[in-house]
């Protein structure tokens, strides 16, 4: 089974790669693709993730790409780890909230709400691509 990670160029990608590698047998993984719109992030964090994954499971194909079509083609599982707007948007969201004496945390506070609103168009875009290119029974 193929698994695709949307946002695979994030700073925590190596940790996700390690967990996937150690648990690949549980879901029958045969291929893992880390996708990110930032080629720069993929060059750094995606390649670290590839190294970690291949050190544990060299028998499973692992790749990184910034092209969503081949990344999603025939994928059975899709994980989203997107941060639309990058770290700059997170910092701005949290500072705006804090300036108004409000919790700015990126998942539960005003920063999280801002991130969710910013993410909707990207998630809808990927959902259309998943519907078109992923396996018919893909799980998002």
What is the predicted role of each segment?
Residues 2, 30-31, 61, 139:
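Residues at the starts of beta-strands that form the adenosine-phosphate
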Residues 73, 79-80:
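Redox-cofactor binding/interface segments in oxidoreductases and associated redox assembly factors
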Residues 3-32:
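N-terminal Rossmann-like dinucleotide-binding module
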Residues 9-13, 40-45, 115-122:
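Phosphate/oxyanion-binding active-site loops and adjacent basic polyanion-contact surfaces
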Residues 61-74:
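Short acidic low-complexity segments
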Residues 15-22, 46-53, 124-127:
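Short, well-ordered amphipathic alpha-helices
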Residues 84-140:
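Rossmann-fold NAD(P)-binding glycine/threonine-rich loop
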Residues 25-52:
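NAD(P)-binding Rossmann-fold cofactor-contacting core
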């Amino acid at each position: 089974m193929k698994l695709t990670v949307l946002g695979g160029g994030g700073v925590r990608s190596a940790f996700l790669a390690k967990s996937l590698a150690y648990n690949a047998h549980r879901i029958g993984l045969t291929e893992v693709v880390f996708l990110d719109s930032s080629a720069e992030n993929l060059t750094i964090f995606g390649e670290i993730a590839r190294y970690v994954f291949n050190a544990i499971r060299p028998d499973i194909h692992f790749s990184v790409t910034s092209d969503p079509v081949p990344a999603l083609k025939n994928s059975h599982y899709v994980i989203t780890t997107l941060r639309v707007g990058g770290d700059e948007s997170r910092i701005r969201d949290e500072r705006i909230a804090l300036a108004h004496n409000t919790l700015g945390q990126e998942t539960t506070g005003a920063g999280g709400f801002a991130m969710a609103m910013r993410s909707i168009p990207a998630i809808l875009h990927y959902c259309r691509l998943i519907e078109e290119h992923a396996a018919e029974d893909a799980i998002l």
